[in-house]
């Protein structure tokens, strides 16, 4: 089999494999299967549809789809004609979805037909946006496959590399688009992913248990596999035993997971785990959230030293650690990647000594630096000179290995998803009997953290009545993963700084 030329644009890598291995399955899912030839042809059709509808390089399109082949066709098409693509988290509320569609300036949105609320919200507030239903029918949208297949499916004669703009939640709860004016060179994390994965297209097959809209499953699981000519199974809804069953059935060799998945699989009875032949699996990459040492150790004890870990974010940065290293440095996320400098700084932006905690800063690349789209203040707040931070706290030991001791003071990480509590605070404060509220992450054995709301009530308020009303309020106003799992009412005042800001870290200390 021919090797893929180096540095070929992501959108065109599929075209290369469509010529060399046209009938090989590129994607298998509960929603359908695509060979490399089919995936490539449909991507071309969509690209030509966009051009025919007067979109030009630099224009924005969005995807709101589950893990299905159409997601990838809606991704690769725009990336071959110089457009900007934004996959959106379909767990968000219609209002949040519409905000991102408007903020990223999407001209076309491909969305699963089952999300009727999204179609209605977008059509009402952004009537000029072209809506397409990825599957089935919706009266407000064009049928995706039926529509694009009217257009030319041959390869684009003069492809232009597009780029993606993914969204990460802001500390105020509003999502932030991670924008780059130019594509950066391949990151060292991506290169280490390929090097350690060591794909063999003639034998390997990947499985993606995470949502394709998320930067990590897309960028470190799906894309590397397809670019290497390796097919991938897209799981629709993750289930521990189902994943083991699929690994056994398809003889999967590569995957990307988060710590919550490790925990759930390890929690399965031994007789359940032993039913499945997992001997084909030889590479598991994980990240997105800290993994307890005992959980990762248990995974390595069970699966062998095939568990690799990275530390990076949508914004960039990067550390990487191989299993043999991790066994010598349990809990570490690795050394800084080649070409990346890491500084641990105190509150005065002074470097701290090895072993001492501080905020983690990464050196920014000279090409393709990120900025938060239409948010200059948030962009400047993330940078310190030529360095940027995701707000994470950690330390570096004397050997240069980095350890995370917590995310930014406010961030809650539940099941690998970042949740910013200010948005939840603001919703609960809508209740007229809530005087003050502070949402925090508290330990959860399965998810890492879960959301707890700590509340000061107005004098004379009835706790039971208010609790019932708060549950209703959260149900109406918050996405499922943002709803508090528990509520606690305090008689004492919540701790505050002289500026009036609640000291969330002091509240959190009560529960850790």
Mark where each language-model region is.
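Gly/Ser/Thr-rich phosphate-binding loop
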Residues: 166, 227, 252-257, 268-329, ...
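Conserved pre-ATP/AMP-binding loop-to-beta segment of ANL
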Residues: 23, 149-169, 173-174, 198-205
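Conserved AMP-binding A3 loop
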Residues: 35-37, 163-189
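Conserved ATP/PPi-binding loop(s) of AMP-dependent carboxylate-activating enzymes
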Residues: 350-381, 417-419
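Structural core segment of the AMP-binding/adenylate-forming
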Residues: 52-53, 80-147, 157, 457-459
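AMP-binding/adenylate-forming catalytic core of the ANL superfamily
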Residues: 71, 92, 109, 245, ...
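Conserved AMP-binding/adenylate-forming core of the ANL superfamily
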Residues: 6, 25-68, 72, 76, ...
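Conserved AMP-binding/adenylation subdomain of ANL enzymes
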Residues: 183-209, 213-254, 268
